[in-house]
Amino acid sequence: MQFVSLNNITLHYQQISGPEDAPAIVFINSLATDFRIWRDVIVQLAGKFPMLTYDKRGHGLSDIGQSPYQIDDHVNDLVALMDRLEISNAVICGLSVGGLIAMRLSKVRPDLVSSLVLCDTAPKIGTEPMWEERMEIARHDGMAGLLKANMERWFTRNFHTHHTAELDGYSNMFLRVPLEGYLGTAAAIRDTDLREDAAKIDLPVMCVVGEEDGSTPPELVLEMANMIPGADFKLIKGAGHIPCVEQPHVLADTLTGFILSQK
């Protein structure tokens, strides 16, 4: 395992080597998950690209830090990590809140970003009352109070029916997220609105969404794609909010095709 201390916290990360002439891909996970969600995509891409993934603060094996957070707390952690590892001009692939981090990163440190893959995300995710309600449930009932609704939004009906062991595993991942990490990041999502920034993105962008995403539905992601000049849009069938889990081969192929199209 790989760890680094920066910005007064310790981050858990994984750096995977690849061809020197290929762009690095940086993966940013969603709320209440850790970087293991990218495992099957990384397996498909191993040997083709250098890759970096990490547990953002308050998640996985990384420190919680001072909660609540602002989106720039997460962005600054990624900036420091990429600078420490001397990674720049990378393809930034962010899922859900990871997409917010990716979009913001492209504005504050454009030298770190060559292109964006925005998975199951939007420049504005949800409403303040929605996030306040979820945060109150978490404060009162812990992560268990949010589990059922989140699993229904995250995964397809087929996954619930035919992948019960995997569903149990991802439920365990969700339940073990530190409460302060969840609350801190939920507050950051609540307070973030990047719609004006999205309309000014001047990079190659691929917007991806699972057909059965119950958190950031396809129409919301398509709206984002239409907002970003020149952005591509990909609907992944047989996937919910986390296509890297349900359709890793499709997402890996989508990433590869998008990156090769930029040469």
Where are these regions (language model features)?
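Short beta-strand/loop motif that positions the catalytic acidic residue
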Residues: 201, 207-209
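Conserved HGGG/HGGXW glycine-rich cap/lid loop of the alpha/beta-hydrolase fold
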Residues: 9-64
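Short alpha-helix in the alpha/beta-hydrolase fold that links the catalytic acid
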Residues: 203, 217-226
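Catalytic active-site module of serine/aspartate enzymes centered on a nucleophile-bearing elbow/loop
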Residues: 231-263
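Active-site loop/oxyanion-hole signature of alpha/beta-hydrolase fold enzymes
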Residues: 39-46, 52-93, 253
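Conserved alpha/beta-hydrolase catalytic His-Asp/Glu region
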Residues: 126-129, 140-200
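Acidic catalytic loop of the alpha/beta-hydrolase fold
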Residues: 211-216
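Flexible "cap/lid" loop of the alpha/beta hydrolase fold
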Residues: 100-108, 112-147
